[in-house]
Amino acid sequence: MGYFCIFALAMKEKNLNTIIDLLERSCSKFPDNVYLWEKRDGKYQPSTYSEVKQQVMYVAAGMMAVGLEKGDRVALLSEGCNAWVYGELGLLYAGGTNVPLSIKLTPKEVVFRVNHSGARYLIVSDFYVNTIRQIEDELTSIEKIFVIRPSHVVEGKYVSFDQLLSSGKVWMEKHPGEVEKRVSSVEKDDLANISYTSGTTAEPKGIMLTHGNYVSNVLQSDSLIQVPEYFKVLLFLPWDHSFAHTVGIYSFMYNGASLASVDFGRSPMEYLRNIPLNMKEVKPHLLLSVPALAKNFKKNIEAGIQLKGKFVQWLYNKGLKVAYRYYGTGNHEGKGMRIVL
């Protein structure tokens, strides 16, 4: 049955073979829909699908201008932000492969993954650039380092991400059609991502995922949980996480919906404090979580309910029971006798 479902989904969207196709489809269907929300100057600012694609094209051109060839690997070490999406999609448009890195990695772990993957370039946010400077001499394959929102002057092999965008714009004007030619060469069996295991029991393994892998996962998740185009998600899971990556970034993109990043602040602790504050600002329709985090959410919610008295607690428990019966497995709305409980 599983293979039949995958085949049926592929036939339904037969022109979707790559992650690039997912963005192109949404830019065609939902050009003015907001895709990304990012907090700047104290307020969440929107970027539409057409605006995102323009930035992606500039990144692709900038990467090609510095010599990125099809199949080259680019490591990405950053908290979730607009530039994370621009960077990954841009390097994919240029035919590259992303090597997303967890922001929780130690310097030694970063060195292993970058060198093992053979990444030629590195995109890093300003918050983690000092970590990279400490191990720069050990990153033997890295030729250029692009810094997102640098707080200090960058020089040498360090280049600001904004400079990558502006140089890409100039390069596109001087080389019309070259980015489009590279884009057309990307196929579903091309490598899109090398996702490393944690390495808790042995050396980390690089899981090689193709464009086709991601597209099939997006279509399968969409068949289970429908995401209307007006939906917003506040994506507080690490963006290199495979769940957040597939469902948060790409499933929402496929449906013309939008995702918001958490305001990182000045430290990981400030990031955690900003999550509930940003939830009130963004008002997301959906949250993605993992068991440990969901358990903490539930614990805090139920602690607050207990403070409101026994009657409110009874209403909560009754509503929870009704919801479980109505939604069944959680894959769809209640049907049949579930409606009357």
Predicted segments, located by residue:
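Structural core segment of the AMP-binding/adenylate-forming
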Residues: 22, 93-167
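AMP-dependent adenylate-forming
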Residues: 22-47, 153, 201
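Conserved pre-ATP/AMP-binding loop-to-beta segment of ANL
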Residues: 31-34, 169-196, 203, 226-232
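Conserved AMP-binding/adenylate-forming core of the ANL superfamily
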Residues: 35-81, 85-89, 106-111, 160-163, ...
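Conserved AMP-binding A3 loop
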Residues: 46-50, 192-218
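A short helix-loop-beta submotif of the ANL/AMP-binding
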Residues: 73, 79-99, 103-107, 115-121, ...
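ATP-dependent adenylate-forming carboxylate-activation enzymes
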Residues: 78-79, 99-114, 126-131, 259-281
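Conserved AMP-binding/adenylation subdomain of ANL enzymes
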Residues: 215-340
